[in-house]
Amino acid sequence: MKANYKKYLLNFKHPSGTSRGVMTEKETWFLMLEENGKTGIGECGILRSLSVDDRPDYEEKLKWVCDNIDLGKEELLAELTHFPSIQFGVETAFLSLVSKTPFELFPSDFTKGTTSMSINGLVWMGEEDFMKSQIEEKLESGFTCIKLKIGAIDFKRELELLRFIRQNFDAEKIEIRVDANGAFKPDDALEKMEQLAKFNLHSIEQPIKANQISRMRLLCENPPIPIALDEELIGVYGIENKNELLEKIKPQFIILKPSLVGGFSGTLEWIAAAEKLSIGWWITSALESNIGLNAITQFTYSLNSKLPQGLGTGGLYTNNVDCPLEISNGQINYNPSKKWNIKNLE
């Protein structure tokens, strides 16, 4: 078996803001395998300052994977515990290699194009007018669940944006999720959540920064809005530690990004730990290209979750890979008549 990797820079169509800053581009790496005339491809992508494997020896580790590809998937994954995004790329590349086609990883009614999956529409942070125009565009596009990034502009103005939505659509028509990316201070998080609760929100992601276990546990005890852990799950290895974290905090939901939590296997460990405690979950992409998004979407469909997933990020870039994934009326579907085009990766 031969393996190589290629770095690729994804360019955002518009600067995209979170409470951690504004992104104009995103680095990713493609891991390519070749054996007996068949090819496999996986994506290894990090989010700077967030991924636990955002470290100087990242590319060196990718080279090590290529040099040692004959160790096989399981042994490689065991050696890559501290590089969850490379675990995801390795899992996907090996699956791609043995699949009927390199991109049909989990054959299903979804990949046949006969069914679709509900997703949330993502509204990025920015100036009030920009956020308002995104909200209007998502609602016109048929989304029934939207997710707003909050914590970057003045909180009162963010409340006004929520008021704008609720004046036009009640919670029966539009489900709203908010993502604070840890922007609230522990001392005023509860008060802010109480103000947000007036707008009948589905959930709030990561209201305070990760690794404040006792403060997060208190917030989760009787929250005005259900709390979903996100960044809190990063860098937690092994099923015992996953169980322990969820038992301590007892959140209402967890959000799983395969590139940040150790690929499909790490995601399945978190789901098992959550379901034991009756904690809900959904899966989101971590701004991967369509290569990674396709893998995550097919995997997610196979798990049969009824909640809207966070998989609507394929249209963010000017130089993404053409693929059969399509979004229509708040649903993501796979159109088998559309072809993959990975020429710009060559």
Report the location of each language-model feature.
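Catalytic core of soluble alpha/beta enzymes
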Residues: 153-294, 298, 317-328
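Long, contiguous hydrophobic alpha-helical segments, chiefly transmembrane helices and signal peptides
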Residues: 150, 291, 309-311
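Short helix/strand-capping turn motifs
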Residues: 304-309, 313-315
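Short glycine/serine- and small hydrophobic-enriched flexible loop segments
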Residues: 96-100, 272, 298-301
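Active-site donor-binding loop signature of nucleotide-sugar glycosyltransferases
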Residues: 44, 206, 311
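Structural signal for conserved beta-strand scaffold positions within catalytic alpha/beta enzyme cores
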Residues: 121, 255, 310-311
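N-terminal capping/lid subdomain adjacent to the active-site entrance of alpha/beta enzymes
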Residues: 1-176, 181-183, 187-190, 194-197, ...
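Short, solvent-exposed coil/turn elements at secondary-structure transition points
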Residues: 8-11, 125, 233, 287, ...
